């Protein structure tokens, strides 16, 4: 496959050239390449090529194939789906049914990342991560309270998460990372206090990174005043001041990765109190991130690529995440000028007008998604 006249970033440098894909890899990047042996040619003039996103925090309550197609539409090529044998990233859930999993066997079967949903069996899980050189993702089970503690929770009479206790379990993992020198990714980080603790432990030698939900950078808790079930997200959204602080942290590279936090709504309840928690957002991941983070100048386009592709690939030790020769050909082709509107009524972003749309997804050199009438062959 030959991508003609592609615009892309090589590190921080904006380039325009042709990109040849062969045998799952990006094999050649040069100007004025000619097709060979009936090679498929895709015209990318006026479009942008970037690495496909990697999402490390997805909950799949729907069929995996359906979830995967939604992800492709949102520019996400690789998914880490909790409790799913088909997950594109082979994960090891360290605890199942309150018992320690057979981590050694699961690692030998191809497990790529170890996930801890609680601090139970902390010592054993930590030693497995170190012994098998497994990246460790801490994705603590949610408390499933609708709001964070504060004035709005009292005003609306909703159950709330008590902020005073949210970091008590995370600190144990932070100290383990420092003491054992284990790379640890803390999932669903949405508190400035947590980020300050991460920085403090990293200053002491820990190897911690933070992953924050995209929704918490775009929305704040004021949306709860409408009692719409689509905003019932776990963990809950923060107040505006906290949200602005998260944006500053992202801008200052204190947040390493972003996640759609996608979880399908397993309920059609009309009342906020009776509805299920969830965040149906992955099919609009690229457009939401581009619109609210890049166009609104929270971060640069290059930094968006880092927090949604490059850093994840490095954490997983994958040969992917950048548009470079000899990297895996996991790419998306996008139209940055296209305008769309979120149509999924279960999405927290429903009705929002977005900029930037995925035209084609390519995984290991093969097209996995193409928008109708997009990326015409030349």
From Swiss-Prot:
GO molecular function: allantoinase activity
Gene Ontology biological process terms, A to Z: purine nucleobase catabolic process; pyrimidine nucleotide biosynthetic process
Pfam families (UniProt xref): Amidohydro_1
InterPro entries per the UniProt record, alphabetical: Amidohydro-rel, DHOase/Allantoinase_Hydrolase, Metal-dep_hydrolase_composite, Metal_Hydrolase
Spans traversing the lipid bilayer: none
Gene3D superfamilies to which the protein is assigned, alphabetical: Metal-dependent hydrolases (3.20.20.140)
GO cellular component, one term: cytoplasm
Disulfide bonds: none
Keywords for the protein's UniProt record, in alphabetical order: Pyrimidine biosynthesis
Function: Non-functional DHOase.
PANTHER family the UniProt entry points to: ALLANTOINASE
Family of this protein: Belongs to the metallo-dependent hydrolases superfamily. DHOase family. PyrC' subfamily.
Name of this chain's protein: Probable dihydroorotase-like protein
Organism, as annotated: Helicobacter pylori (strain ATCC 700392 / 26695)
């Amino acid at each position: 496959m030959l991508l003609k006249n592609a615009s892309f970033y090589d590190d921080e440098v904006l380039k325009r050239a042709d990109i040849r894909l062969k045998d799952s890899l990006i094999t050649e990047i040069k100007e004025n390449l000619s097709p060979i042996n009936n090679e498929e040619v895709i015209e990318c003039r006026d479009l942008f090529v970037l690495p496909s996103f990697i999402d490390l925090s997805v909950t799949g309550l729907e069929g995996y194939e359906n979830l995967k197609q939604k992800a492709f539409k949102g520019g996400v090529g690789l998914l880490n789906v909790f409790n799913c044998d088909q997950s594109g990233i082979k994960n090891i859930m360290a605890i199942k049914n309150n018992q320690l999993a057979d981590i050694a066997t699961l690692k030998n079967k191809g497990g790529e990342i170890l996930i801890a949903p609680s601090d139970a069996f902390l010592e054993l899980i930590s030693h497995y991560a170190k012994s098998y050189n497994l990246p460790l993702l801490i994705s603590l089970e949610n408390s499933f309270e609708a709001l964070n503690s504060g004035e709005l929770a009292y005003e609306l009479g909703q159950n709330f998460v008590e902020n005073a206790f949210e970091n008590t379990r995370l600190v144990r993992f932070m100290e383990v990372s420092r003491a054992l020198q284990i790379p640890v990714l803390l999932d669903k980080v949405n508190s400035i206090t947590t980020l300050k603790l991460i920085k403090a432990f990293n200053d002491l030698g820990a190897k911690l990174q933070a992953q924050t939900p995209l929704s918490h950078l775009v929305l704040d808790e004021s949306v709860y005043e409408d009692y719409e079930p689509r905003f019932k997200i776990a963990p809950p959204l923060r107040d505006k001041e906290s949200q602005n602080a998260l944006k500053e942290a992202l801008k200052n590279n204190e947040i390493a990765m972003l996640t759609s936090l996608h979880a399908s709504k397993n309920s059609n309840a009309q009342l906020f109190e009776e509805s299920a928690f969830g965040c149906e957002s992955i099919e609009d991941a690229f457009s939401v991130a581009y619109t609210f983070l890049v166009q609104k100048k929270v971060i640069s386009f290059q930094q968006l690529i880092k927090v949604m592709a490059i850093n994840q690939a490095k954490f997983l030790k994958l040969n992917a995440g950048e548009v470079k020769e000899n990297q895996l050909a996991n790419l998306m082709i996008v139209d940055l000028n296209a305008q769309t509107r979120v149509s999924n009524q279960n999405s927290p972003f429903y009705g929002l007008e977005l900029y930037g749309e995925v035209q084609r997804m390519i995984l290991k050199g093969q097209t996995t998604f193409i928008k109708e009438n997009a990326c015409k062959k030349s």
